[in-house]
C-alpha cells in the first residue's frame, strides 16, 4: 500500500521518502518545492502548497500511511506547525488513510515554556483526534548537517553550550519510523506516543565537538549556512529543553520497535 510523506522537501522528510523507496514500496511525496531526486528515484510527486487540503486529500487516495515531519526546532512561525497538521488531519480523514505517523519534541504540551513545544503539543492533540491509528514520535535533537550549521553559527553562549541534549542520528530516527509502521501494521485504532531519545546525554558543546564542529573562534563557520535572525530567535527559545522524555507513561520507541540507536559521531554523514 502507498505511503505519502508530507512536506517532502524538508531534509528529514526527504530522507524518509528515499528510504521507503529503497524498500521497494510505492511512495508519494507532497510538496511545493523541488524534489527532483525523489521523482528520479521513483516517487510520485504531488505538487501543492501545505494549506491546500483538497489537493492533499486527492494525493492521499488509497494511501495506507502518512508520515508528517512538521516544522523543526528553528521554525519561525510556531502557529504554522499547528495549521499544517490540521490540514494533514483533515485530508487524511477525508481520504480514509489507515495510519499516520508524526514527529514531535520531548516536553511538547500546552504548558511548555517555549512556543515551539506548545505548538507541538497542540499538534499532538490534533493527531490524537484523527480516527485512524496514529503514532507520535517525540524525537530529541536530530543530528543533521542543518542542525550542525544552525548550532555552529548561532553564537551560543557558554550557558547554552552547557545545555544537555540526547542527540539522535537522523538515520536511526528514519529506521525507527519505518519500524513503527511495520510494528503497528495490524492496529485498527488507537493513539501511541513514543520517545526517541539518543542513547547518550551530553552537552551541546560536547555534541558539536563529537560531530566535528570546532569551538567558537575556530574554523567552525567555514562552509556553513548562516541562519536568519528569526531562526536564531526561535532556536534560543527552544534550546532550554527538555531534550529527553522522563514520563513513564510514554513508551521508549527503540524498545517498542526493537531497535538500537547509536550516538552521533565523527564518522556520521547524516544528510539533511
Where do the protein language model's features map onto the residues?
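Mid/C-terminal beta-alpha module of Rossmann-like enzyme folds, strongest
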Residues: 2, 174-272
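N-terminal Rossmann NAD(P)H-binding glycine-rich loop of SDR-like oxidoreductase domains
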Residues: 2-25
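Structural signature of the Rossmann-like NAD(P)-dependent dehydrogenase/reductase core
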Residues: 5-6, 68, 99-102, 135-138, ...
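Structural motif corresponding to alpha-helix initiation and N-cap regions
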Residues: 14, 50-53, 82, 86
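N-terminal Rossmann-fold cofactor-binding loop
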Residues: 29-34, 49-50
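Conserved Rossmann-fold cofactor-binding substructure of NAD(P)-dependent oxidoreductases
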Residues: 39, 43-64
Amino acid at each position: 500500500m502507498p505511503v505519502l510523506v508530507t512536506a517532502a522537501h524538508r531534509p528529514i522528510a526527504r530522507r524518509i521518502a528515499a528510504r521507503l523507496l529503497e524498500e521497494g514500496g510505492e511512495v508519494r511525496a507532497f510538496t511545493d518545492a523541488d524534489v527532483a531526486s525523489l521523482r528520479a528515484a521513483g516517487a510520485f510527486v504531488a505538487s501543492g502548497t501545505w494549506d491546500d487540503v483538497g489537493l492533499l486529500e486527492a494525493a492521499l487516495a488509497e494511501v495506507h500511511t502518512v508520515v508528517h515531519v512538521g516544522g523543526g526546532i528553528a521554525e519561525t512561525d510556531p502557529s504554522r506547525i499547528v495549521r499544517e497538521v490540521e490540514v494533514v488531519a483533515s485530508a487524511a480523514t477525508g481520504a480514509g488513510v489507515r495510519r499516520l505517523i508524526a514527529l514531535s519534541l520531548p516536553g511538547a504540551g500546552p504548558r511548555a515554556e517555549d512556543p515551539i513545544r506548545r505548538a507541538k503539543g497542540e499538534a499532538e492533540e490534533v493527531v490524537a483526534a484523527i480516527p485512524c491509528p496514529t503514532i507520535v514520535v517525540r524525537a530529541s535533537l536530530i543530528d543533521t548537517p542543518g542542525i550542525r550549521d544552525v548550532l555552529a553559527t548561532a553564537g551560543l553562549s557558554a550557558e547554552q553550550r552547557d545545555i544537555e541534549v540526547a542527540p539522535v542520528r537522523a538515520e536511526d530516527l528514519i529506521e525507527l519510523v519505518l519500524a513503527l509502521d511495520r510494528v503497528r501494521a495490524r492496529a485498527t485504532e488507537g493513539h501511541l506516543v513514543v520517545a526517541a531519545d539518543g542513547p547518550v546525554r551530553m552537552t551541546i558543546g560536547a555534541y558539536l565537538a563529537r560531530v566535528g564542529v570546532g569551538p567558537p573562534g575556530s574554523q567552525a563557520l567555514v562552509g556553513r549556512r548562516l541562519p536568519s535572525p528569526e531562526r536564531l530567535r526561535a532556536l534560543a527559545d527552544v534550546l532550554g529543553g527538555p531534550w529527553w522524555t522522563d514520563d513513564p507513561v510514554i513508551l521508549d520507541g527503540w524498545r517498542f520497535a526493537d531497535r538500537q540507536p547509536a550516538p552521533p559521531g565523527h564518522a556520521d554523514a547524516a544528510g539533511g
